Each structure stands twice: as structure tokens, then as C-alpha cells.
């Protein structure tokens, strides 16, 4: 054995230990559906994107059934700027008029969706890109948001334009794709009963998909480590009741609130557990599913 091979042995032993640790986790998830929401910001780093695609292929080859839902907010914003279309946000959601929804569909269901399919294909996976309009997979209704005016303390409804909320998921479309041993890559664009195209928040879309599929896990990849306490430290595990309490006491605020609402909805629809984790961490998905340490904040119906 050469000196270089001898020097490499400790690293090989570490990798072997990792594989041994991963085996029971792989067996636990065998043939189980895992829905992964892949955020727009996490896609900005090419190396991280390739790592993500590699992880997805490894999940599929390990016996899991990964379903990918992607966002694309930053990419949409850049395209709107290039086209001279002004972006407006109300209550954290993009106000979507007729011109904007065309751009949203073009960016999400077109360039981003096919880019992710290409990354997975490059790693040896078989992926298919779809959006909620394909096969009438996700029907949506116009979203409504009610806010309290801080001056009058009266409620008022916020008009978000062509922003939709999932109303019905046609599971048969997804079942057919999974039966064909393909990895679905889904853009959060849905259709109304009248044929209108709707822009759907990617977290909300992923929650609806996971609920319809009764997924084993829903992973929400974000730009933060998970749910943080008031001292900005990661909370490793929460129950649904804990989540509601932390929202009520102001620990969970801002953009994390709709993510928590998605988690609660998915769990109430039959998803076993949801994890909010940092998509910028290398191989975060594998760390969560295949190691004893996990990653991010695990949310389940009740405390273990």
C-alpha cells in the first residue's frame, strides 16, 4: 500500500461509519414519499445547486420517492426588473397582475423548472418538470389575506391580484409520475376552475402536495438554520402546539409565520413531520434524513 493510500485510510473509515449510520435511516424511509421545497435563494449558488441535485438522486437510488417543489422569487424579481415591470409586495406576498403572472409562469415553469431537471439529469437521475396546470394537477382559488389596521384596529382585506391558494390536488397525476420511477419537479403555478393562471407561494404549494400525498416528510429549505428562539438559537424540535404558542408570544414572526402555517396544515393533512432547514448547508437534505444529528427544526403533531 502506498503512503498516499495509507494517509487516506482515516477518511475512508469516517465515510464507512457514515454509511453504517445511514443504513437504518434508509430502511426507515424505503418506498416513502419525501416532499422537498427548494427555495429560490438556495438556487443562487451553482455548487450548492449541484449538491442538491446529487442528494435528490441519492435519495431516489436509496429507495425513497423524492418530490421537488421549487420557488424562484429572486429570479422572478430580476426578470420583472429587466422587463420594466414594477414589483409590489403586500403582507409578504407578491401582488400579481396579468403582466406579472405571465412572467411568473415563464420563469418558474420555464427556465427554473427545466434548469433543476437538467441538474438532476446530470447526476444520473430521471426527472420530469411540471407545474400545477399540467394534468389539472393543482386547482387554486384567489388568495385572500386579512390584516388588522394598526391605527383603527379594524380588519381589512388585502388584494393580492392573481395570487392563488391550492384548493384541490389531483394526486393521480403525481402517482402516475412516481409509478414511472420519475422524480417530479414542480413549479408552484396553478389553475383556477375558470382556467385562470395563479401564482402560488412555493411553501404553500409544497404543503398542499405533501398533504395530498400523505408524505413521510416535508422539508422546507430556507435561508436560516430553522426556527429560532428569542436568543436567536436554533430550536431543534417543536410540536404543533408549541408552534402556535411561539407565534402567539411573538417568538416566531415575519416570514417564518407562513412557513409555520404550512407546517401545521401539512401535518393536519397526514404528513408525519415537517423540517425547516437551511438550504445553503452542503447536503442538508442527507444530514436531515440519513444521520442521527438531523438538521434544522423538526415539527410534528405532538412532542415525542
UniProtKB/Swiss-Prot annotation:
InterPro entries: AceGlu_kinase-like_sf, AcgluKinase_fam, ArgB, Asp/Glu/Uridylate_kinase, Glu/AcGlu_kinase, NAGK-C. This is Acetylglutamate kinase. GO terms for cellular component: cytoplasm. The lineage of its organism: Bacteria, Pseudomonadati, Pseudomonadota, Alphaproteobacteria, Hyphomicrobiales. Belongs to the acetylglutamate kinase family. ArgB subfamily. It is found in: Cytoplasm. GO terms for biological process: arginine biosynthetic process via ornithine; L-arginine biosynthetic process. Pathway: Amino-acid biosynthesis; L-arginine biosynthesis; N(2)-acetyl-L-ornithine from L-glutamate: step 2/4. The gene is argB. One of its GO terms (molecular function) is ATP binding. Keywords: Amino-acid biosynthesis, Arginine biosynthesis, ATP-binding, Cytoplasm, Kinase, Nucleotide-binding, Transferase. Substrate binds at residues 72-73, 94, 199. The record marks 37, 259 as: Transition state stabilizer. Pfam families: AA_kinase. Catalyzes the ATP-dependent phosphorylation of N-acetyl-L-glutamate. It comes from the Bacteria. Its EC number is 2.7.2.8. It comes from Methylobacterium sp. (strain 4-46). Its main location: cytoplasm. It catalyses: N-acetyl-L-glutamate + ATP = N-acetyl-L-glutamyl 5-phosphate + ADP.
